[in-house]
Curated annotation (Swiss-Prot):
The gene is fadE. Belongs to the acyl-CoA dehydrogenase family. This is Acyl-coenzyme A dehydrogenase. Signal peptide: none annotated. It comes from Escherichia coli O157:H7. It catalyses: a medium-chain 2,3-saturated fatty acyl-CoA + oxidized [electron-transfer flavoprotein] + H(+) = a medium-chain (2E)-enoyl-CoA + reduced [electron-transfer flavoprotein]; a long-chain 2,3-saturated fatty acyl-CoA + oxidized [electron-transfer flavoprotein] + H(+) = a long-chain (2E)-enoyl-CoA + reduced [electron-transfer flavoprotein].
Length: 814
């Protein structure tokens, strides 16, 4: 009985930690339990004495502070990693949303499902059905990329007329004031037609003058610029990146010096600016330049410090000394992008966004706004491109036949095709969920980094898979190619607004560990403020948090999550339970990593990256489950849900295993392995059988396939190869049973080619009627259009045709 009572006590302790019961209540329960065991004669009543001696200091604050918290506080202040001003501003910027729940080890799934699903307003839907549809029809991506290296003038004019550049600008200034969800849908639709079109519209609606002015501009700046930006009268760009500072944007060398100078014939207080920027989208054609630079005030003309820090100003490009116009040439996807320079350019101090009082506040302004733009524009562009590519590749895989069968029925094709379909579903779920948070007023900085990285990364991988499937059709550029420019341009999204290597290795967990953790940021603030009283309360909450996640990790690993709560009892029930387990694992691994590695964790980028991978996969899986719930839990969509969540579970577990295999403290790694994997690894990547189901969805028209491609431009217009493939898929499917019947009548397995000739012969023999013959003829036209590629006269391809030397006439000897 003694052994059983000890085991029962251990179970009780575990239950208290598991359910996160407060320290005081837990102490009372332990004392009552021990007393009950004493009354029952199982334990000596004297055990209460040492137990009370142990528990009293923990519950009596003055004693606890002097004996425990104060020494820990002193040690914490010594090992706390140094934080630069820019790092602090980045961490302080924005808010924590659903990713905070995932990070804390006990997600509230009901809260996730109660987040309201965004809906398009009638105005937003009309814009998508009208101006956006027309802009897509007008866009000829081959002409844009190969012939013009720009949007055609009539398309530029149309975008300005219909205020495409004003989606984020408030209506009081003449803007559209669309929701984040509507912006995402617009960009997805445009991206499926032309990457250049989507980038051109997306950038002014992301981080730039419009966004910064609305948040920080003076009334005079807003009244002057916002209506002009809304009408397209002004074209904005924002210059941050320089040759010496790319990912390390806080190290920009561009300078401004506060001084007096002549402006329009008068001596005014202003700034003398020198900059050298590159990779600036819309810079070659911009009329107003947003500029980030480091401002100093050596004469203290503003009355404050000398070194003011990063500042943002708005400068008309007609200002003397501003150099724009030259272009970069990014991967044959020639959107307007180029350098801008200026040397000793004098401008009034009022050109600072927000006026002189915002001098030195530029970095805070940027990071506060960046999470919104980064969370919408890049994920939406990548997602829209993949959604259209998914439909087109699925259609092509059905239409294209080799060895007398559709290539989509071959297992070698099914594997990448399933990845494309699964990624399209997951990316759309992830890109949509973050818009929910933004529409609720959140500025989820960590979540925007997750969505930016994984949508662009999965987008690139999906485009590569599509190229492998389509082969020559995807390689040969021309009017009928739906893939090659997306393939060429994929690295652009990978690189901009936080290069993906940086984002994964430093930003997701680097910010998430502090921003999403329930206690670390407040503990750091308490240490900075030398407030041991606040630190004491946080410390013991933190200790309970770690203990809870340790118990939860072990128990949920032992039971594979079977005892944890779930909001549903259907086919997705086990996924919630698995995610409960992984969330506890992440919380434990994060705390242990921070405790063992301390400030050096910032430099252990591969450890940080793997912790970020776990958090990211938890988000992607929860986004899939949220999408499935929001769309009515359609069982036909379950193959995509299974694929998305199983892929996330497998990758998260792989990241945990890799982390433990490479954890620098091998003793701690061994202990963590026992707690996290008490019965070993269990999650598998999506099976071949599941891949088969998912790949099949893309190859025939159905409701699930339509949901994958929701909102995309699928009209079979002249310059829309995706829409033409959709039309061809319907034509070929309509012809297939007629072809099979003819084969059966003739007793031959005829190839699915020359259907027009087959129609003529079968009609002559009375095997089919005229309507069926017409179906076969149309299918053959569509089939040939789908599999054929473009060819050109040599002169059409050369920007500078080679001039062959004139032949020298031979002079015969006399």
């Amino acid at each position: 009985m003694m052994i059983l009572s000890i085991l029962a006590t251990v179970v009780l302790l575990g239950a208290l930690f598991y359910h996160r019961v407060s320290l005081f209540i837990s102490s009372l329960i332990l004392l009552a339990w021990t007393a009950a065991l004493g009354v029952a004669g199982l334990w000596s009543a004297w055990v209460l004495v040492p137990l009370a001696i142990i528990l009293v200091p923990f519950n009596f604050a003055p004693m606890r502070k002097s004996m425990i918290s104060a020494p820990v506080f002193r040690g914490f202040r010594k090992v706390m990693p140094p934080m630069s001003r820019t790092e602090k501003e980045a961490i302080d910027a924005g808010t924590t949303w659903w990713e905070g729940d995932l990070f804390q080890g006990k997600p509230d799934w009901k809260k996730l499902h109660n987040y309201p699903q965004p809906r398009l307003t009638a105005e937003e839907q009309a814009f998508l059905d009208g101006p956006v549809e027309e802009a897509c029809r007008m866009a000829n991506d081959f002409q844009i990329t190969h012939e013009l290296a720009d949007l055609p003038p009539e398309l530029w004019a149309y975008l300005k007329e219909h205020r495409f550049f004003a989606m984020i600008i408030k209506k009081e200034y003449g803007g559209l004031e669309f929701s984040a969800y509507a912006q995402s849908r617009v960009l997805q639709k445009l991206s499926g037609v032309s990457g250049i079109l989507a980038i051109t519209v997306g950038v002014p609606n992301s981080l730039g003058p419009g966004e910064l002015l609305q948040h920080y501009g003076t009334d005079e700046q807003k009244d002057h610029y916002l209506p002009r930006l809304a009408r397209g009268q002004e074209i904005p760009c924002f210059a941050l990146t320089s040759p010496e500072a790319g990912s390390d944007a806080g190290a920009i060398p561009d300078t401004g010096i506060v001084c007096m100078g002549e402006w329009q014939g008068q001596q005014v207080l202003g700034m003398r600016l020198t900059w050298n920027k590159r990779y600036i989208t819309l810079a070659p054609i911009a009329t107003v330049l947003g500029l980030a630079f480091k401002l100093s005030d050596p004469e203290k003309l503003l009355g404050g410090a000398e070194d003011l820090g990063i500042t943002c100003a708005l400068i008309p490009t007609t200002t003397p000394g501003v150099e724009i116009g030259r272009r970069h040439f990014p991967l044959n996807v020639p959107f307007q992008n180029g350098p801008t320079l200026g040397k000793d350019v004098f401008v009034p101090i009022d050109y600072i966004i927000g006026g002189p009082k915002m001098a030195g506040q530029g970095w805070r302004m940027l990071v506060e706004c960046l999470s919104v733009g980064r969370g919408i524009t890049l994920p939406s562009n990548s997602t829209g491109g993949v959604k259209s590519v998914a439909l087109a590749t699925g259609a092509y895989a059905h239409i294209r036949r080799q060895f007398k069968i559709s290539i989509g029925k071959m297992e070698g094709i099914e594997e990448p095709l399933a990845r494309i379909a699964g990624n399209a579903y997951v990316m759309d779920a992830a890109a949509s969920l973050i818009t929910y948070g933004i529409m609720l007023g959140e500025k989820p900085a960590v979540l925007s980094a997750i969505v930016k990285y994984h949508c662009t990364h999965r987008g690139q991988q999906s485009i590569i898979d599509a190229m492998d499937i389509t082969g020559g059709k995807g390689i040969m550029l021309g009017q009928s190619n739906f893939l090659a420019r997306a393939y060429q341009g994929a690295p652009i999204a990978i690189t901009v607004e936080g290069a993906n290597i940086l984002t994964r290795s430093m930003m997701i967990f680097g910010q998430g560990a502090i921003r999403c953790h329930p206690y670390v940021l407040e503990e750091m603030e308490a240490a900075k403020n030398n407030d041991v009283n606040v630190f004491d309360k946080l410390l013991f909450k933190h200790i309970g948090h770690v203990g809870s996640n340790k118990v939860r990790s072990f128990w949920l690993g032992l039971t594979r999550g079977l005892t944890s709560s779930t909001p549903t009892g259907d086919a997705t029930k086990r996924y919630y339970q698995h995610l409960n387990r992984l969330s506890a694992n992440l919380a434990l691994l994060s705390d242990v990593s921070m405790a063992v590695l301390g400030g050096s964790l910032k430099r252990r980028e591969r450890i940080s990256a793997r912790l970020g991978d776990i958090l990211s996969q938890l988000y992607l899986a929860s986004a899939v489950l949220k999408r499935y719930d929001d769309e009515g839990r359609n069982e036909a969509d379950l193959p995509l849900v299974h694929w998305g969540v199983q892929d996330a579970l497998y990758q998260a577990e792989q990241a945990m295993d890799d982390l433990l295999q490479n954890f620098p403290n091998r003793v701690v790694a061994g202990l963590l392995n026992v707690v996290i994997f008490p019965t070993g690894r269990h999650y598998l990547a999506p099976s071949d059988k599941l891949d088969h189901k998912v790949a099949k969805i893309l190859q025939v028209p159905n409701a699930t396939r339509s949901r994958i491609g929701r909102g995309q431009y699928l009209t079979p217009s002249e310059h829309n190869p995706v829409g033409l493939l959709e039309e061809a898929l319907v034509d070929v499917i309509a012809a297939d049973p007629i072809h099979q019947r003819i084969c059966k009548e003739l007793g031959k397995n005829l190839p699915f080619t020359r259907l027009d000739e087959l129609a003529h012969n079968a009609l002559a023999k009375g095997l089919i009627d005229k309507d069926e013959a017409a179906i076969l003829v149309k299918a053959e036209e569509s089939r040939l259009r789908s599999i054929n590629v473009d060819d050109f006269d040599p002169e059409e391809l050369a920007t500078k045709p080679v001039k062959l030397p004139e032949k020298v006439r031979k002079v015969e000897a006399a």
